[in-house]
């Protein structure tokens, strides 16, 4: 990860969500139809994807698979559903989820973010900004969270547990976040 960050070349590292992977596996096993009721419930309540009709879930799964297949690196949970999803990821390298957590490494990949314009898309916007301001206290003596040229945090839409997001669909929420990302000036998006 660090080498790619330092190279300046575009790349995609992905972290696969467990419920998302189960939904995609269900899609691949059933030809995109007849999603299991528990799959619909989990993808809505645990991942915030809505509505959970076949057309929405099929569109979600197609995008998810395409992203996985185009990723340079995927971090996996090592759950059974992943086997179905990663079959078509011929050029993708895989790692365990923990490998993306920089504080576990003597030479953290995140050190390569020093001096870069960093965009973070996350539901905990305020917390991230507050913690970044205290970065020297978080990991003393380690280069886990260096000083960035700038930090922009886009508030991720969070629709877990069926909570109202103010959007008609997960795709409408995604489009709004994409517009905010497109308006930001950044070198690296997390």
Residue ranges and their predicted role:
Residues 147-188:
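A mid-sequence, solvent-exposed acidic-amphipathic segment
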